[in-house]
Amino acid sequence: MELVAGCYEQVLFGFAVHPESEACGDHEQWTLVADFTHHAHTASLSAVAVNSRFVVTGSKDETIHIYDMKKKIEHGALVHHSGTITCLKFYGNRHLISGAEDGLICIWDAKKWECLKSIKAHKGQVTFLSIHPSGKLALSVGTDKTLRTWNLVEGRSAFIKNIKQNAHIVEWSPRGEQYVVIIQNKIDIYQLDTASISGTITNEKRISSVKFLSESVLAVAGDEEVIRFFDCDSLVCLCEFKAHENRVKDMFSFEIPEQHVIVTASSDGFIKMWKLEQDKKVPPSLLCEVNTKARLTCLGVWLDKVPDTKESFPPAAEPSPVSKEQSKIGKKEPGDTVYKEEKQSKPNTKKRNLAGDSKKATKESGLVSTKKRKMVEMLEKKRKKKKIKIMQ
């Protein structure tokens, strides 16, 4: 198990987790050991995603970098977007989905690292996306004030819902029976069977991250030191606790045998791991913490395994019928605009390989490809500076 975190300082941190409990009275305590620090990008990191083999990072430098966690080498880089990478999501070990400020959503083959589909998803920026547990649907939100549903089996848009405001987070529940849409400090809870808002929760500050701890309990972090657990059925706050000395930037939740853990990262530089109690009204207990001394932006946990998932996308050769989930989520709600999108831009069929050798990466080839990329970036910066001087 390994914690990975990105920061404004362009660095990716890796910390090995040792869950063996230490003797500390009745309090269980884990240990964190620094494994690596890697100068990953030429701008601040904005997103991270993990599967059983790779960690991928997105940045304001418009690139996605891939790291082989088993070999502990940089595997290469994906260059397709022309804006800050805002979100990265793996589905199983086979596919990666990326969203960016250029309005594109890209579906990548996580074996060959080819761009299988490039979709103009939003008229503005793509701010967040979430994949349904079935792998057949995805939701995305953007700066065009829409919530969009994607048929991942066919690789096309299914429905567009006008939500009248710019949302910055959308998240499915573990069973996919409901989802939340975050607008500033407001949480709208949608039920899949009715496609309507069943309730609204208001947080004190702007929300930066949410994670479902169960089908009905939602952890909420924002521009403050406190984390709150809300019941999505009763809409009440079950508990709140001070997690950090500064605003919480990201959270990650996972389960291992006899343990349910939530990990938090903050602008104060700390990454902390907390043990969740069965009764979510009881605040979690601190397992371990580490100070990176950096301004953290994003967080992931590499578990060396992923849950069993049925690979339902990328686009199939033949169109599939609209699923029950799509029919439900596409229901019209009074006061909202919901319609099925007819036109779709042509898919980008051009294959885009990793930077460097397309063969199986070795430690040497991975390093060479990284050096070449950095040299090109330096030359490009010098050319731009010369052009500015000539213009002056």
Labelled PLM ranges:
Residues 1-4, 52-56, 65, 74-76, ...:
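Structural hallmark of WD40 beta-propellers
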Residues 8-31, 60-62, 66-70:
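Beta-propeller domains
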Residues 9-13, 43-46, 61-65, 73, ...:
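Short coil/turn segments within WD40 beta-propeller repeats
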Residues 153, 157-243:
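Eukaryotic tandem repeat interaction scaffolds
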